[in-house]
């Protein structure tokens, strides 16, 4: 299958005339993050997690940039995401489906597009066998998260052998890696190590996600699966490793006006001006994915200034207190990016950066900013069959 070419400047020209709420995708920062994680992974291979449209950043530009940097193994959620990713990356990349199979019909998609699904139940093996699946699968085991994972993996391994289904590796997932001192980390890591040694020592093993790679590097095994760290959010905020935000979410100033002391702002009159003030109407709202809970507590950044969000965020707009600022109509303010990290914004809402990034919807165009020319790379190893 011929990979579709990625031309970031063409994409920019197509979207520049749209509504002035934009997410710039800084691909140089993506490469910085990838190389930072590559160094930490040492001997382990990188399986780049690009599910949910690359955490809201745009699957095509993110995956192709990583592939050009030497990454050969990617993970998405399901067969539909996998088929789309295959069209972007061509036939050489390995593509793993972390959520596995939801129905038997997906086996045909996996076969056609050379996708490597995760299996967790006997029915998955039956589906694969019935469709004469000739690819590989990953076995996912539950070591304590109580989410997706086989409870009796030794039985599934035996069944795979009986049905002549090739295993690419064995994996599990950490529940508390972003809390390094949590005792469940050791419980899961020890359980996974022992399980791997007991039932599949010959298979590649994968346990660590982004936070795990930072907190538990001794458990790298053969393959690590960074996700959020690729996009520049620090997985463990109090242990930063110098990641750079890839997405810069911005909105353009549509109007500036003076309001008098005692005036109320926006829906519900939830903000009352304590003094005469100047406000700016910005083209970004909850209809774009800006969390409405930032109303009256969040802020935007402009030339190093923090401009408070005042009044309730509307579907299409929000209001900023710009008193004393040099801000003008048509200027652009940033809601998160390098100057205002997604970790900082998430902490205001007692949430995680994942929800911010994946919450920005398709009404906001992603404008890729091309990286600087890169030196020749040594390709990272692939995991699982790619056909």
Which positions does each model-derived feature cover?
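Active-site anion/phosphate-binding pocket segments in diverse small-molecule metabolic enzymes
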Residues: 2-27, 31, 81, 101, ...
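Active-site-proximal beta-alpha core segment in soluble small-molecule metabolic enzymes
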Residues: 21-24, 31-32, 39-198, 202-204, ...
């Amino acid at each position: 299958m011929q990979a579709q070419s990625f031309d970031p400047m063409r994409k920019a020209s197509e979207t520049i005339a749209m509504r002035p709420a934009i997410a710039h995708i800084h691909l140089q920062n993506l490469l910085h993050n990838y190389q930072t994680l590559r160094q930490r992974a040492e001997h382990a291979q990188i399986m780049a997690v690009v599910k949910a449209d690359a955490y809201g950043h745009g699957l095509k530009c993110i995956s192709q940039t990583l592939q050009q940097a030497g990454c050969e193994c990617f993970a998405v959620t399901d067969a539909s995401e996998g088929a789309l990713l295959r069209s972007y990356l061509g036939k050489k990349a390995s593509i793993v489906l972390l959520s596995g199979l939801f129905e038997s019909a997906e086996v045909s998609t996996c076969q056609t597009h050379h996708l490597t699904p995760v299996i967790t139940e006997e029915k998955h093996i039956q589906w694969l066998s019935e469709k004469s699946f000739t690819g590989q699968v990953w076995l996912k085991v539950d070591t304590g998260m109580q989410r997706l994972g086989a409870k009796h993996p030794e039985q599934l391994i035996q069944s795979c052998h009986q049905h002549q289904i090739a295993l690419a590796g064995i994996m599990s997932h950490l529940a508390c890696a972003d809390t390094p001192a949590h005792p469940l980390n050791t419980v899961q890591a020890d359980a996974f190590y022992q399980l791997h040694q007991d039932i599949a020592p010959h298979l590649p093993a994968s346990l660590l996600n982004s936070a795990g790679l930072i907190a538990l590097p001794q458990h790298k095994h053969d393959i690590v699966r960074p996700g959020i760290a690729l996009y520049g959010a620090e997985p463990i905020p109090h242990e930063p490793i110098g990641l750079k935000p890839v997405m810069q979410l911005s909105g353009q100033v549509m109007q500036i006006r003076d309001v008098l002391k005692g005036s109320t702002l926006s829906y519900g009159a939830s903000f009352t001006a304590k003094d005469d003030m100047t406000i700016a109407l910005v083209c970004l709202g909850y209809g774009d994915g800006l969390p409405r809970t930032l109303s009256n507590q969040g802020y935007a950044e402009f030339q190093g200034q923090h401009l408070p969000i005042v009044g309730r965020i509307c579907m299409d707009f929000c209001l900023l207190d710009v008193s004393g600022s040099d801000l003008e109509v048509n200027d652009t303010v940033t809601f998160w990016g390098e100057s205002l990290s997604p970790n900082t914004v998430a902490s205001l809402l007692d949430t995680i950066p994942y929800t911010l990034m994946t919450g920005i919807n398709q009404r906001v165009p992603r404008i890729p900013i091309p990286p600087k020319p890169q030196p020749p790379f040594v390709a990272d190893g692939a995991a699982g069959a790619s056909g």
